Design a protein with these regions (language model features):
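Core segments of cupin and vicinal oxygen chelate
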Residues: 5, 34, 43-84, 89, ...
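N-terminal pre-domain/capping segments
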Residues: 20, 31-40, 61, 98
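Short, flexible, solvent-exposed loop/turn segments with mixed acidic/basic and small polar residues
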Residues: 32-33, 88-92, 180-183, 237-241
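Structured segments of extracytoplasmic/periplasmic soluble domains
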Residues: 45, 55-63, 103, 115, ...
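A mature extracytoplasmic/lumenal domain signature
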Residues: 60, 79, 88-90, 101, ...
Length: 333
């Protein structure tokens, strides 16, 4: 083991007690938890739904597995039921990732409310931090809550596909095919990175409420939290009190090769960002190499990002990616 490896490991081990204490898992062992199983979907608010639909179907060849009202359709990721939804941003809402959804076995809204109440989340008629609310979409109950920063989280049954029926699990028997084959076949959701005002507080919330274990470290005090049995996860980063939100989403593909993916993106019109600084502009790509001090491989773990027509940041990684070390980020705890 190299000196830098020993240094990183030593600092991670020293950080463990503080992280566990901040999580509250040891301090509050008797509170019930909501055991989430998987990431289900994300909803993007976009300035031009037709343009975004053409973009995501053109790049990924995503079929439509269901429709909700006037939306452009729910774009299936892999074999489903996971999906990407598009909605018009409107004059008072900026484009971005509005919310993400996780699934629960035997979803029961009433029982979920009781568990959340034990953690200080109160039932409400309106969104807000530490609030929970439901809405009826036809005969489908859709459950939402706000985390400590008010970031929107949806909870549904594991069978939920955004369709009809009490559980929202009745989708098209045959999805509407994409008009374009697509250049990259995405297989699943990997993770969401949340920009939060207080990482310790948010980490405590997600670990206590959902029983999430630490799956990997991206730095001594930056654990990522497993969703279900992994490799899916949530990552938390401090973005300042004025900027809580969902910073980016990640999807996976087979045979991930950064150079080939960058070329494919360029052929589609998503050009390399180069040396530009600050927030990425629309339709650019870039690779960040996560080194050993941030839990990456000794030679670096490449992490590939691109932006859509609204500048919404997306990440692409291998299907084995778990946010850990290794050349594919596939080595986790």
């Amino acid at each position: 083991m190299s000196p830098s490896s020993q240094f990183t490991r030593r600092h991670i081990l020293r950080s463990l007690p503080a992280i566990v204490t901040a999580s509250g898992v040891m301090a509050q062992p008797n509170k019930p938890t909501i055991r989430v199983r998987a990431l289900n979907h994300m909803t993007l608010f976009v300035s031009d739904p037709k343009r975004s639909l053409e973009f995501y179907q053109g790049l990924f060849g995503m079929p439509i597995q269901a429709r909700q009202g006037d939306s452009g359709g729910l774009l299936r990721i892999g074999t489903g039921p996971q999906y990407l939804a598009l909605a018009a941003a409107g004059p008072n809402r900026k484009p971005g990732i509005d919310h993400f959804c996780m699934t629960v076995d035997g979803f029961n809204p009433g029982q979920t409310l009781k568990i959340l109440a034990a953690h200080g989340v109160t039932q409400s008629d309106a969104p807000g931090p530490m609030k929970a609310w439901t809405r009826m979409r036809g005969d489908t109950v859709e459950f939402h809550l706000g985390d400590p920063d008010g970031i929107l989280v949806q909870l549904q049954d594991t069978s939920y596909c955004g369709g009809t029926g009490q559980l929202g699990n009745q989708c098209f028997a045959t999805p509407e095919p994409s008009p374009r084959k697509g250049l990259i076949a995405v297989r699943d959701l990997s993770h969401f990175t949340l920009s939060v005002s207080d990482a310790n507080r948010s980490r405590a919330f997600y670990r206590e409420v959902f029983g999430m274990r630490i799956q990997a470290y991206q730095g001594p005090s930056s654990p990522v939290l497993a969703v279900g049995m992994g490799p899916q996860f949530l990552a938390l980063g401090r973005g300042g009190a004025a900027t809580p939100g969902i910073a980016h989403a990640c999807m996976t593909m087979e045979g991930f090769n950064p150079d080939r993916v960058l070329k494919t993106l360029a052929d589609f019109g998503i050009k390399p960002r180069g040396e530009a600084r600050g927030p990425a502009s629309p339709l650019v790509s870039y690779v960040n190499t996560r080194m050993e001090d941030r839990g990456g491989a000794k030679s670096g773990t490449p992490e590939l990002y691109f932006t859509d027509p609204d500048g919404i940041v997306m990440q692409l990684q291998d299907v084995t990616y778990c946010g850990g070390a290794g050349s594919l980020g596939e080595v986790c705890l």
